[in-house]
């Protein structure tokens, strides 16, 4: 088994444990949605998840996808990303990281910048806000779109 597959399986097991701890029933559809999110590096929309899973789950609906994503979000194993357009994207990586977004094709890529980890503490100190989280986005044109 490759390291990536082992990592996906480990993340899936941890997510299932979180769902069980919250009293959520584990269904094959939930597992498939989670597995897709964990293995996806594209921050998919609910429609993209639906299109990827519907061949294996012909009775699954977009509403089922949305309902499960809401459950995952409420438990804290998925983040919903909204960007002014009408479709939310979903990110399994809930650790502090940032996004660079292609202005032409909408591709979203994660990147780390550890120096920003202190920004919440600094903002809280300077403003007396109770900071809950932060989000940073950088926009540009990806290599694939530049080459077109």
UniProtKB/Swiss-Prot annotation:
The record, for InterPro entries, names: FUR, Fur_C, WH-like_DNA-bd_sf, WH_DNA-bd_sf
Compartment annotation: Cytoplasm
Gene Ontology biological-process entries: negative regulation of DNA-templated transcription; regulation of secondary metabolite biosynthetic process
Task: Summarize induction of expression.
Answer: Autoregulated. Induced by low levels of hypochlorous acid via superoxide dismutase inactivation.
Which UniProt keywords are given for this protein, alphabetically ordered? Answer: Cytoplasm, DNA-binding, Manganese, Metal-binding, Repressor, Transcription, Transcription regulation, Zinc
Q: Name one GO molecular function term.
A: transcription cis-regulatory region binding
> What GO cellular component term, any one, is given?
cytoplasm
Q: What does this protein do?
A: Manganese-dependent repressor that controls a regulon of oxidative stress resistance and iron-storage proteins. Regulates expression of genes encoding antioxidant proteins, such as katA, ahpCF, bcp and trxB. Also regulates expression of the iron-storage protein ftn, the ferritin-like protein mrgA, the ferric uptake regulator fur, the manganese transporter operon mntABC, and its own expression. May act as a hydrogen peroxide and organic hydroperoxide sensor. Required for full virulence in a murine skin abscess model of infection.
* Family, per entry: Belongs to the Fur family.
Q: What protein is this chain from?
A: Peroxide-responsive repressor PerR
Species name for this entry?
Staphylococcus aureus (strain NCTC 8325 / PS 47)
Coding gene? perR
